[in-house]
Amino acid sequence: LGLAIGLGLTLLAAIAYRDNPEECGLRPDGIQSTSTQDSQAGVTGVSLQRARQTPAFWIFIAAMFMSGMVGTALPFHIVDIHVQAGLDRSSAIAMFLPTAMIAVIVHFIGGWASDRTSLRPHLVLYLLGMIVTNVGIVYLDQSWGRPAIIVGYGIQGGMARLLSSVTWPRYYGRRHLGAIRSYAVAFGVAASALGPTIFGLSVDWFGSYNVAAWGCVTILIFLLPLTAFAREPHLSGQSSQ
């Protein structure tokens, strides 16, 4: 099955995949281009090295790193988190459907709004979603704890998919998008491995997940005022697309 899927997707990618819209004579927004040469000339952007010199780059990286930690730690330990709060396994598993529905709605509305607003409000909402999620973990034994996790984790998930797709081309252009996004993904992968470990150690050392959750809340609150510095950099060598 794995071999069939691998070969099938490889063949499909070879037939249908295109490196950029300009190869099809299109612009990223879907407007038909009048000239292929003009379209190719419109692919602009700055290098990874230049992007790393901007505060906004690291602020978004930090937010996505925290999202990677929380986003993997919660599903990894979700059953035990509920058991510690006196809830059963079915309650834990039942959280994922409403969470996914909220994530889809947030992603759709956020995507529409991102074409019309700065990404900083989206980043703030992203961080707030993670804060609400972790506070919900701590107070899961309260009546509002479980809804807090569902809403917060849904917001986090919707914003995570949006910002990981929109931020890098908008802030740094598309010419070096592969290098920039790969660099960001590497941090996300590291965070995904670290998150479950930290929450697991919290249980081993302190007897609950609260220490890890409060630690995440502390870092996220620290990041909130930094969103004021996450403005679009408008670097030299990059023009609007």
Give each language-model segment a name.
Residues 49-110, 195:
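Extracytoplasmic gate region of multi-pass secondary transporters
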Residues 3-37, 223-231:
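C-terminal membrane-cytosol helix-exit motif in multi-pass small-molecule transporters
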Residues 9-13, 79, 194-203:
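Small-residue (Gly/Pro/Ala) motifs that create kinks and tight helix-helix packing interfaces
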Residues 82-83, 113-114, 198-207:
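Interfacial helix-cap and linker-helix signal at transmembrane-aqueous boundaries
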Residues 168-178, 207:
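Paired intracellular helix-loop junctions of major facilitator superfamily
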Residues 89-90, 174-184:
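Loop-to-transmembrane helix entry/capping segments in MFS-fold secondary transporters
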Residues 71, 91, 97-167:
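C-terminal transmembrane helical hairpin of 12-TM major facilitator-type secondary transporters
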Residues 1-3, 200-219:
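A membrane-interface helix-boundary motif in multi-pass transporters
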